[in-house]
A protein has these predicted regions:
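ATP-binding N-terminal substructure of ATP-dependent carboxylate-amine bond-forming enzymes
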Residues: 1-95, 99-101, 105, 112, ...
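Phosphate-binding site of ATP-dependent enzymes
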Residues: 159-240, 267-271
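Short beta-strand-to-turn element immediately C-terminal to the catalytic PLP-Schiff-base lysine
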Residues: 123, 151-157, 193-195, 262, ...
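Active-site nucleotide/adenylate-binding loops and adjacent lid/helix of ATP-dependent enzymes
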Residues: 1-14, 99-187
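ATP-dependent carboxylate activation and anion-phosphoryl transfer catalytic cores
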Residues: 5-8, 114, 231-316
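A short glycine-rich, hydrophobically flanked beta-strand micro-motif that places a catalytic Asp/Glu
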Residues: 44-49, 178, 182, 252-264
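Hydrophobic beta-strand scaffold residues
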Residues: 43, 88-89, 117, 138, ...
């Protein structure tokens, strides 16, 4: 039990205007419902809008549960605002959020610490119409989006022309800066970290295509195997990498690290893809699922995240 005062004024900040707005609304509703069910008497749901600072100034919360996903709630913007206002908030601070949302910056921090990540290059979307940035197959993803928004797998002789033609309707067309990475064969896995401790490994098995936005948030489109059926050494390695990434980036509260594992290469085939500092808290989300596997109910998970936000030295 967290021992939190049930009279704390908790504002659950959700919604916003990113491509992940719908997910944020689901996460926020789940958090607010759980707090109310656990006896918290002052829970306010706040839909993120451009007057958010004025609203928070009126509400004067003791703590904000940041249930936003994508910009501006996951890139350090909202975190910086809350720091300036002197309001405690959940999850990672301003600098960590700004680094982790940018996949190129994340690599710059983690790779020197020995964390294996795919080698890639940043390209602008217009250059794709001149030719492929690297040999196929490769993955294209926006530099600073989450939830697999805008991700495309470009295959040899496959889905988007050769070179990508101006007529190709690829998801990259909505973004200026893209990260191109070699496609890594194998299995999709993820590790949640809570309070600095890795919980377990989940394998994600989409029933069609890859683990994109729809597969993540549509019930029945992806099988979650939790805990993943992988050798203990592989699970330990992934959990160690996730905990290290959480620490080196300076994450707080909960984070989630996504991996690809080429199982033909053993431990040498483990690649960290990205670290999510604002992981989903919906009914289908992976952090609550792994918490349940560890015997932590959803409501307790929410309280633990808030308790860390209110701990001495945790602000921002």
């Amino acid at each position: 039990m967290s021992g939190l005062d049930k009279n704390l004024h908790i504002v659950v900040l959700m919604g916003g205007w990113s491509a992940e707005r719908s997910v944020s609304l689901m996460s926020g509703a789940g958090v607010a419902d759980a707090l109310t069910e656990r006896g918290f008497t002052r829970v306010t749901r706040l839909n993120m809008a451009h007057d958010v600072a004025a609203k928070l100034g009126e509400l004067k919360p003791d703590v904000v549960f940041n249930a936003l996903h994508g910009t501006p709630g996951e890139d350090g913007t909202v975190q910086g605002m809350l720091d300036l206002m002197g309001i405690a908030y959940t999850h990672s601070g301003c600098a960590t959020s700004a680094i982790a949302i940018d996949k190129e910056l994340t690599k710059a921090v983690l790779v020197p610490h020995g964390i294996r990540m795919p080698k890639g290059k940043v390209v602008d979307s217009a250059s794709l119409y001149e030719g492929d940035p690297m040999p196929r197959p490769y993955v294209l993803k926006p530099v600073n989006e989450g939830s697999s928004v805008g991700v495309a797998i470009v295959t040899e002789g496959g889905n988007h022309g050769h070179p990508i033609s101006a007529r190709a309707e690829g998801p990259w067309k909505h973004f200026d800066r893209l990260l191109a990475e070699p496609f890594i064969r194998g299995r999709e896995l993820t590790v949640a970290v809570l309070g600095g401790e890795a919980m377990c490994v989940t394998e994600l098995k989409p029933k069609a295509g890859f683990y994109d936005f729809d597969a993540k948030y549509t019930d029945g489109l992806t099988e979650h195997v939790c805990p993943a059926e992988v050798p203990p050494a592989i699970a330990d390695s992934m959990m160690g990498m996730a905990a290290a990434a959480h620490r080196f980036l300076g994450c707080k509260g909960a984070s989630r690290s996504d991996f690809r594992w080429d199982d033909e290469l053993g431990e040498a085939g483990i690649y960290l893809l990205e670290v999510n500092t604002q992981p989903g808290m919906t009914a289908l989300s992976l952090v609550p699922e792994q918490a349940r596997q560890k015997g932590i109910a959803y409501g307790e998970l929410v309280e633990r995240i808030i308790a860390e936000a209110l701990s001495p030295g945790q602000a921002g």
